[in-house]
């Protein structure tokens, strides 16, 4: 009986951890980079050039190449190819094209889910 209880606890714990790391949508604060700040054409942390018309983003922790769904008034899928943002209180930096696609002007709250 004790073994079944232990196994059940382990299973529930693993399920909760999986929900935290894969696909769980959560609120984050997004900002726009690569437009007026002069980053267009500069190198990203993974060596690519910042392409202001691409659907890419910068995130501090997600691995390069990770695809995330970002929603504001609309939703778009972006690929993480840079590190940042380095401004306190912000969680993800979007290129101008990605920000326009979701209706984000400058800085705002978005829903983020990893694909």
Where would I find each of the regions flagged by the language model?
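Secreted/periplasmic proteins
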Residues: 2-8, 16-115
